[in-house]
Amino acid sequence: MHNLIPNVQKTMEQSFIAYIENSIKNNWDLDALTDYKGATLQYKDVARKIEKLHIIFEESGIRKGDKIAVCGRNSSHWGVTFLATLTYGAVIVPILHEFKADNVHNIVNHSEAKLLLVGDMVWENLNESAMPLLEGILMMNDFTLLVSRSERPVSYTHLTLPTIRL
């Protein structure tokens, strides 16, 4: 019976990714995520941003099962980061943006996250030296590199993605 568990998990993971992929394909030109009084991302925009994050994760050495922390206000980019992390096969570590900096540091350290994506309001209160296990910290709204402790590049703000044909 215990041999079924990995197969069930793999099937559920594949189903989730297929569900996201099909949603994007079937709604390509429709609105997907909107910030309150802000920009709206269509499904095609979400797909391109997910692809960009996947490239950043790969180039950063993130592997399936690695942890990626995210701490910022609810936004379309928070949603994109969440979807990109899960579809990449990494584990998302969501942290409430209302937490005090010490609590954020403790959660990041305890989770053994390799990357942290933060919102600008959160970043101004954090101390990167209090999170020594992180390999990189990126700004959530545009994926720019804030801190890198790796020889690997972790941000590609200049990256232009190819046109995705679905």
Annotate the PLM regions.
Residues 59-60, 87-153:
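Structural core segment of the AMP-binding/adenylate-forming
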Residues 157-163:
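Conserved small/polar residues in nucleotide/adenosyl-binding loops
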Residues 1-14:
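Flexible, non-catalytic linker and terminal segments flanking ANL/adenylate-forming cores
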Residues 10, 36, 71, 116-119:
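Active-site-adjacent beta-strand anchor residues
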